[in-house]
């Protein structure tokens, strides 16, 4: 056992301290200024007792907190927690030698997440499937009965989702993950992690899965993209468009966070004639942007582009949209192709957009709106743009994954 003083919260949400011999220690579920007694395992500590609690400590919102690995910071009061999220953005920018105005963090409300990944395991003898999230720093499963982060309609479906998971556990090597999205027409579930080398899911298991899906009144169930049950098309509204989601497609996790980011993008596109929406997905930004400007949209996923194109005709009052399936890593939109583009909106995956950023930097584009789920790769791409003459005007942190260490952001560049 060691008594430790927590000096700060690290990037993964753990408390940072120094042991008696000066070595770094990482202690989860602690807060700055606290003195704790911890059981050490190498550099990691587990709190045994809080000797001096922080005045910023609050009661967690969830009974599973501390064991479930989904949340790391429920025990921290809202104001310092949000300030810490903004500081993580500032730190990553500073590592690339960048400074800018960081606006107040947009905080997504609890009980609003519409997209989750639930893991399924076999229950005990005579029991059904267990469904939940992984334990903190473990492969073990925490069976959940509540989740204050998630939309209550999805939480209410947990028993039906557990019944759906049972047929997918027929093979001992299967470890299913249910990727669940709440849409306007019901739950859309894509299931991965099912052993398929031994002939795949049996006919009996498919039949039982379809029956469970019907009883749960799900919109659609797919197995790694293959539809095994479809009562109705999963639909989402993006701007003025209604989009039919392809299986396994990306959608922002929290509608309020999506709305905030879209509003920022549309505000920056005011007065533009042509906008490029890169890594457009199914059109999260494309359709709202098309209310104010012509839009060129590019995305690697061909099914996403097909869904986007199919929705254009049913969306009234939009300016022209051109969309293509394009790998923006292997075939980024060239600077010459951006010659008549006024604004670029780019929302890459966590790895960033190094190849595409080089082409934007070489172009004559006057404004870039960067949306990112990874401040580290955003900062690296931002450095390239700034070196090419852009100014990073401001950044808005977006706390979409509330109580987790993850932070998203929207940055505005001009030149």
Swiss-Prot record:
Biological processes annotated in GO: rRNA base methylation
Any Pfam family the entry gives: TRAM
Enzyme Commission no: 2.1.1.-
Enzyme class: transferase
Binding site for S-adenosyl-L-methionine: 252, 279, 299, 347
Binding site for [4Fe-4S] cluster: 62, 68, 71, 147
Keywords: 4Fe-4S, Iron, Iron-sulfur, Metal-binding, Methyltransferase, S-adenosyl-L-methionine, Transferase
Residues annotated as catalytic: 373
The family this protein is said to belong to: Belongs to the class I-like SAM-binding methyltransferase superfamily. RNA M5U methyltransferase family.
Name this polypeptide is given: Uncharacterized RNA methyltransferase CC_1326
GO molecular function: 4 iron, 4 sulfur cluster binding; metal ion binding; rRNA (uridine-C5-)-methyltransferase activity
Domain (TRAM) ranges: 1-52
InterPro entries: MeTrfase_TrmA_AS (IPR030390), NA-bd_OB-fold (IPR012340), SAM-dependent_MTases_sf (IPR029063), TRAM_dom (IPR002792), U5_MeTrfase_fam (IPR010280)
């Amino acid at each position: 056992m060691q008594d430790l003083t927590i000096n700060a919260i690290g990037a993964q949400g753990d408390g940072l301290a120094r042991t008696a011999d000066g070595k770094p220690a990482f202690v989860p579920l602690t807060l700055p200024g606290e003195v704790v007694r911890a059981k050490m395992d190498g550099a990691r500590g587990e709190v045994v007792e809080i000797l001096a609690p922080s005045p910023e400590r609050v009661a967690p919102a969830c009974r599973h907190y501390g064991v479930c690995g989904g949340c790391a910071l429920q025990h921290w009061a809202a104001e310092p927690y949000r300030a810490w999220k903004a500081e993580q953005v500032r730190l990553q920018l500073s590592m690339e030698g960048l400074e800018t105005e960081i606006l107040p963090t947009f905080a997504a409300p609890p009980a609003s997440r519409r997209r989750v990944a639930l893991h399924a395991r076999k229950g005990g003898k005579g029991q059904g499937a267990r469904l939940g999230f992984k334990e903190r720093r473990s492969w073990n499963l925490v069976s959940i009965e509540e989740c204050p982060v998630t939309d209550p309609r999805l939480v209410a479906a947990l028993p039906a989702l557990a019944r759906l998971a049972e047929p997918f556990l027929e093979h001992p090597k299967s470890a299913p993950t249910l990727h669940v999205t709440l849409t306007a027409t019901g739950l859309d579930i894509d299931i991965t992690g099912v052993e398929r080398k031994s002939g795949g899911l049996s006919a009996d298991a498919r039949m039982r899965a379809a029956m469970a899906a019907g009883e749960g009144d799900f919109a659609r169930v797919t197995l790694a993209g293959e539809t095994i049950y479809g009562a109705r098309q999963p639909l989402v509204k993006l701007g003025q468009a209604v989009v039919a989601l392809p299986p396994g497609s990306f959608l922002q996790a929290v509608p309020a966070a999506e709305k905030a980011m879209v509003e920022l993008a549309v505000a920056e596109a005011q007065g533009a004639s042509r906008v490029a929406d890169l890594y457009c997905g199914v059109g999260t930004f494309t359709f709202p942007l098309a209310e104010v400007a012509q839009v060129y949209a590019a995305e690697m996923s061909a099914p996403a582009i097909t869904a986007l194109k199919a929705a254009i005709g049913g969306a009234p009052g939009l300016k022209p949209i051109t969309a293509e399936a394009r790998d923006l890593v292997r075939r980024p939109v060239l600077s010459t192709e951006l010659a008549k583009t006024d604004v670029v909106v780019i929302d890459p995956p966590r790895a960033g957009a190094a190849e595409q950023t080089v082409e934007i930097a070489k172009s004559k584009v006057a404004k870039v709106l960067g949306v990112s789920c990874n401040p580290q790769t955003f900062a690296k791409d931002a450095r390239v743009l700034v070196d090419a003459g852009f100014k990073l005007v401001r950044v808005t942190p977006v706390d979409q994954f509330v109580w987790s260490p993850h932070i998203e952001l929207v940055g505005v560049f001009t030149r």
